[in-house]
C-alpha cells in the first residue's frame, strides 16, 4: 500500500469510547477498524462480568458474540464445570447461524425502510454531529489534541505493533 508522506487519512484505528448516559455509564465500547486487515467483519462482543464469588479456578470468559457481517450468527460462550470429580472449567458455546437465504443486504433494508417512511435505521443529526466530533479529534494535530495518533508503516496483519498490543488487552475471543 502506498500512502503519501503528507497524507493525514487514518488507515488504522483502535480505541475505547464511552457513552455519556446513565444506561451505559462505565461500559467500554471498543472499536477496531482499518484497511487491509486479515478479514472483515462487523460484530458486537458483550463480555459478561465475572460473578463476585469464584467457585472454580481459571478465567471466566462468559460472553455473547453477535456477528452482523459476514454470515450473521449469534454465539453465547460460557465456562461451565467439566463433568466429573475435578473442578475444571471448559468452554461451552451455543451457536445460532441465520439462514443465508433469508439474509438481506444492508442497502435493501435501507431502501425498503425509505420507501415505507421508516426512519428508525437512519442516522439522526445529533449522531452525525457526534461522529464528526470524534473524527475531528482523530484528525487533530498539535499540542491541543485530545487523542494521541501514532504514525506507522503498514506491514500487514492487524496493523502496527502498538495497535496489536492495545487490542490484546481487550481479551477478545478468537
PLM regions: where:
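Secretory/organelle targeting and membrane-embedding segments
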Residues: 4-174
Amino acid at each position: 500500500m502506498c500512502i503519501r508522506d503528507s497524507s493525514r487519512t487514518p488507515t488504522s484505528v483502535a480505541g475505547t469510547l464511552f457513552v455519556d448516559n446513565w444506561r451505559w455509564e462505565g461500559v467500554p465500547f471498543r472499536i477496531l477498524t482499518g484497511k487491509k486487515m486479515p478479514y472483515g467483519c462487523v460484530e458486537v462482543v458483550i463480555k459478561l462480568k465475572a460473578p463476585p464469588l469464584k467457585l472454580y479456578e481459571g478465567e471466566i470468559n462468559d460472553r455473547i458474540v453477535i456477528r452482523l457481517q459476514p454470515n450473521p450468527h449469534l454465539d453465547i460462550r460460557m465456562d461451565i464445570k467439566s463433568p466429573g470429580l475435578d473442578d475444571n472449567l471448559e468452554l461451552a458455546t451455543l451457536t445460532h447461524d441465520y439462514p443465508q437465504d433469508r439474509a438481506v443486504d444492508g442497502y435493501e433494508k435501507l431502501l425498503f425502510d425509505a420507501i415505507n417512511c421508516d426512519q428508525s435505521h437512519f442516522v439522526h443529526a445529533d449522531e452525525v454531529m457526534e461522529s464528526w466530533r470524534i473524527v475531528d479529534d482523530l484528525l487533530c494535530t498539535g499540542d491541543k489534541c485530545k487523542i494521541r495518533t501514532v504514525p506507522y508503516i503498514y506491514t500487514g496483519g492487524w496493523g502496527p505493533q502498538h495497535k496489536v498490543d492495545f487490542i490484546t488487552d481487550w481479551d477478545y475471543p478468537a
